[in-house]
Swiss-Prot record:
Prodomain residues: 24-35
Biological role stated in the UniProt entry: Female-specific peptides with potent activity against Gram-positive and Gram-negative bacteria. They have as well hemolytic activity.
Recorded superkingdom: Eukaryota
GO biological process assignments: defense response to bacterium; innate immune response; killing of cells of another organism
Annotated protein name in UniProt: Ceratotoxin-C
Gene name of this polypeptide: CTXC1
Quaternary state and interactors: Homomer of four to six subunits.
Temperature-activity profile: Thermostable. Still active at 100 degrees Celsius.
Subcellular compartments: Secreted
Keywords attached to this entry: Antibiotic, Antimicrobial, Cleavage on pair of basic residues, Cytolysis, Hemolysis, Immunity, Innate immunity, Secreted, Signal
Signal peptide: 1-23
Keyword Glycosyltransferase tagged: no
A GO CC annotation given for this chain: extracellular region
Disulfide bridge positions per record: none
């Protein structure tokens, strides 16, 4: 379960970093930054809904390969 949480957190951080690079919000325009972060969070929730079941399905296979 800890591995799934770690993968999930890595995905969220990567998604936020990618979004910040692509959107390039300016520091003085706080409204744009807030909207960008809101979009990132809602996007991360959508990604998590797909990624968590995939992670749960893949984890036993990886455990068999490793162990």
């Amino acid at each position: 379960m800890a591995n799934i949480k770690a993968v999930f957190l890595i995905c969220i951080v990567a998604f936020i970093a990618f979004h910040c690079v692509v959107a390039e919000p300016t520091a003085e325009d706080s409204v744009v930054v807030k909207r960008s972060l809101g979009g990132v969070i809602s996007g991360a929730k959508k990604v998590a809904k797909v990624a968590i079941p995939i992670g749960k399905a893949v984890l036993p296979v990886v455990a068999k390969l490793v162990g």
